């Protein structure tokens, strides 16, 4: 089964998305937190054996360098170099933001003109499912990366994991839906409480993605960095407003 993630136009697009979650000036954003979220996202994709293109890995290497510089003792020369790398990164993100806004403005003007000169296209275009309240797939992956890291630590401490030959996404989809029986919503991390190993955790997550893709589930996150909840999608159901 092919699950298509939200496509970013490149690593700067992903970083801009992460920075925008803080709703503050780019130069005031806690860059170490942004770096950790980026690296967690890339690591999660790799753990799920999903393809990560080279440019994302190059950026990951640069971010790891910035992070390591910030962890070094406060030696003046090293600090200056670390600050330069950080400021250069933030400048790249800010410059990318300006170009993206300009591109969106030009595209909007183009669409306005097209309405007067041509018939609107009738082709139906499938778009990847997004979280309600303008949350995107990346927010779901960031939440899952934290869950996966905690479960890995839990399994390592227990020293015992129950292994099976194979976990099927179709079977896990049934488990996810059954978890919502009798509930209005289910906190995402609670879905993985009974998982016995990493493979089961990942398959459960893939099943959740598939249920979102088929519009059987919706997800609610009331605020940035807040808990994500699963809800069964019902006819003409109203999503709680934040």
UniProtKB/Swiss-Prot annotation:
GO BP, one annotated term: cell division
Keywords linked to the UniProt accession: Cell cycle, Cell division, Chromosome partition, Cytoplasm
Any single Gene Ontology cellular-component annotation: cytoplasm
Keyword Iron: no
Broad class of the protein's primary localization: cytoplasm
Keyword GTP-binding: no
Entry's localization field: Cytoplasm
Function: Participates in chromosomal partition during cell division. May act via the formation of a condensin-like complex containing Smc and ScpB that pull DNA away from mid-cell into both cell halves.
Family affiliation: Belongs to the ScpA family.
Subunit note: Component of a cohesin-like complex composed of ScpA, ScpB and the Smc homodimer, in which ScpA and ScpB bind to the head domain of Smc. The presence of the three proteins is required for the association of the complex with DNA.
Name of the protein described by the UniProt record: Segregation and condensation protein A
Organism: Streptococcus pneumoniae (strain Taiwan19F-14)
Name of the gene: scpA
């Amino acid at each position: 089964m092919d699950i298509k993630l939200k496509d970013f136009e490149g690593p700067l697009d992903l970083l801009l998305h992460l920075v925008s979650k803080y709703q503050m000036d780019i130069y005031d954003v806690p860059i170490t937190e942004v770096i950790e979220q980026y690296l967690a996202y890339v690591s999660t994709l790799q753990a799920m054996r999903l393809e990560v293109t080279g440019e994302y890995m190059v950026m990951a290497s640069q971010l790891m360098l910035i992070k390591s510089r910030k962890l070094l003792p406060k030696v003046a020369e090293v600090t200056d170099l670390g600050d330069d790398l950080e400021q250069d990164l933030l400048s790249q993100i800010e410059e990318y933001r300006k170009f993206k806004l300009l591109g969106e403005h030009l595209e909007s003007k183009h669409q306005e003109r097209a309405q007067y000169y041509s018939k609107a296209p009738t082709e139906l275009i499938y778009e990847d499912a997004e979280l309600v309240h303008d949350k995107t797939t990346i927010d779901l992956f960031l939440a899952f990366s934290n869950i996966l890291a905690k479960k890995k630590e839990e399994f390592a401490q227990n020293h015992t994991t129950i292994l099976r030959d194979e976990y099927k996404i179709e079977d896990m989809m049934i488990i996810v839906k059954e978890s919502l029986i009798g509930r209005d919503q289910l906190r995402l991390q609670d879905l993985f409480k009974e998982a016995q190993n990493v493979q089961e955790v990942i398959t459960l997550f893939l099943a959740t993605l598939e249920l979102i893709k088929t519009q059987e589930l919706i997800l609610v996150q009331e605020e940035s960095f807040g808990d994500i909840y699963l809800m069964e999608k019902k006819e003409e159901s109203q999503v709680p407003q934040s």
